[in-house]
Structure formats: C-alpha cells, structure tokens
Amino acid sequence: MKWKEQAVILGVRQYGETSVILEIITRERGRYMGVVKGGRSRRMAALLQPGNFVEAEWSARLEEHLGLFRLEALDFHAARLICLPEALYALQLIAFHLRLLPERDPHPVLYDILHLFMQNFDEPFVNAELLVRFEMRLLEELGFGLDLSCCAATGRKQKLYYVSPKSGRAVCEEAGEPWKKKLLILPQFLVQRATRPADFRDIINGFNLTSFFLMRYVWEPRDIKQPSVRTNLIQLFERRFGIQAFIC
C-alpha cells in the first residue's frame, strides 16, 4: 500500500530510540499517523514541527498497518508561528478539535479551512474568523450542525440576529426581541456574504456561540473540559479586540 499527498503536520511523539510517530492531516485521507525513521535526529527536527506543510508519502504492507512516512518540505510555517502567539494557540486548538474525529476519516472542508488559516496566520482578525468557521463546521461534521438558513419562528431569511440555545436554529430580530436575553447572538459574518472583515464583536460572539454548542454536544458528553489552549486564545483575542467573551 502506498499513497502521496500534501499535508499539515499536527504533532509528533517519540517511537523507539531514533524514530517518531508523526501525525498529519491531509485533504483526501484525513488525519493519519505513521513512523518516521530517524525522526529524532537533529537533521529532521526543523521539518517535524507542527504547522509545517509537507508532501507526505505513506507506505505499508497492509492498509491497517501504522506504516512509514517519507516527507518533503513544502513550507516551514512553524518557524514563523513561534513569533505569533494567537496563531500558535489556534493551530494547537485546531489539532485538538481534529483529534475528536476518527483517524483516517477525510474531512476536506475542515482541511481547506486549516489550509486557508495557514496562509493567513499573521492576520489575527482573519484567523479568528476562520477559527469560528472551523468550529462551526466541526459541529456539522460531528452531526450537530446549526440551522442558520431561516428563522425558526417565522421562516424569514432576513435579519437573522439570534440562535436558539434549545434548537440550534436561527431566530430573526423581530421574533427574538422579547426573548433576546435567553438567546445567543448570531455573528453576521456567518449568514451574510462577506463584504468586509468581521468586526471584533462579531468574532467574540462567534466564539460564544461555538462554545455553547461544543460544550453541550461534544465536550460534556465525552467528559472533556474546554481546552485550556482555547481559553488562552480567546483571552489573547479579548486583549487585542478590547471585548470580553462569555466562556461556557
């Protein structure tokens, strides 16, 4: 068995005295692990860093085997990520989320968002918005997608300003006004065609929205606490944006 595909490195751990087990994410094959022989050498250290973009060739006698990786560097993102705490935290959070999905299960949309993030990780507003979109898509991939197509109460598709915490459906401004204290705010960049970057408050509202449903449907059922890296990341965004988020 053999395949070759572009990938982003997610993590690495020791395997024996000289090798490592590498974890990558590819578009067509999902999250994959394999052995890199000699991966603990100084020569390989710079390559095997989370965030680096590589061409990975995997081979094994049988498909179910762990297999071996051979790598070719395409872009050394990791060296620049170290200088950007928001981007570094975001990549760690994305890796945490991807590990909630089955290994070798392709999720091309999540990969595409990650790849776009890697191209814009030095733009904090852009990568904050992309991270919210990633978490929204993660909920959908796990079977808990929100319905933002129309108002749950009226069927209207315009002026969708809220999300019902009970149903996960959008609610328009008029129908939601009497109950707005019990509803979640819907970031407009999730329902309107983007004509400008999301503003600070929309981004924080996006994190509040995904926090609520990730806690309800993903973290609590799996007995997982909200990852500390996510809390740290949002606190960095709060300081940058000057707006406080509600953390579930």
UniProtKB/Swiss-Prot annotation:
Cross-referenced SUPFAM superfamilies: ArfGap/RecO-like zinc finger, Nucleic acid-binding proteins
Keyword DNA repair: yes
One GO cellular component, as annotated: bacterial nucleoid
InterPro entries, per the entry: ARFGAP/RecO, DNA_rep/recomb_RecO_N, NA-bd_OB-fold, RecO, RecO_C
UniProtKB keywords: DNA damage, DNA recombination, DNA repair
Function statement: Involved in DNA repair and RecF pathway recombination.
This protein's name: DNA repair protein RecO
Organism, as annotated: Bartonella tribocorum (strain CIP 105476 / IBS 506)
